[in-house]
Amino acid sequence: MTRDEARAKVIFALDVHEFSDVEQWADMLAPHVGMFKVGKQLFTSCGPAAVRMIQKCGGEVFLDLKYHDIPNTVAMASLEAARMGVKLFNLHALGGYEMMAKTVETLDKEFKGGERGKVLAVTILTSSNEQTLQDVGINIPVPEMVVKLALLARKAGIDGVVASPQEVPLIRKACGKDFLIVTPGVRPAFASSDDQKRIMTPAEAVRTGADYLVIGRPIAAAPKPVEAAEAIIDEIMAVEG
């Protein structure tokens, strides 16, 4: 694995809400990370302009809005995301087969087999555990539920999933090697676990076979963010040899 290939695995969670911060972080980190994750707070505050600014600075975008609605609404929102030129965007697998399949059908009709952003299905949020599922009436262990949702997403034609690193081996076994897996819940050894309950280090996550790692505060809160990003890349390369 080259350094560029290792860098491509790193998605920086751009958890800001001011447009000036978007420009600052994109300009600083575009050469040092593979992608920037734009979530609900930033997109609600700044809209598509945040995506365009990152792209202007040479960065790729993971639009993390987790669509979950009736099938046509999600399909149309996904189409607009793809038209923005983002590399990844997502929806909730819990929205069901019809919602996911309609989205893929709509994208395929628009892009006619051409290159487009990859659509991912969120399985179970990394802040969730067995008790969280039981509280909403799901009496299935987290790993089993994650695999169930991943298989449903694959059946619907979705390109991959967002899942905790602990479930990556199970998803790989169930869904195959050509199914993208993006994992949050990744924290270098020097960082705290924050609000995510199912976590791993970057080295551990890559070792399990994750394609992309979402990392935010360990880079953003570091005294020297560029050095923190490069240290994570070093760790990924060490794992791969």
Curated annotation (Swiss-Prot):
Substrate binds at residues 15, 37, 64-73, 126, 187, 196, 216-217. The active site is at residue 66. This is Orotidine 5'-phosphate decarboxylase. Keywords: Decarboxylase, Lyase, Pyrimidine biosynthesis. GO terms for cellular component: cytosol. The keyword Transcription does not apply. Homodimer.
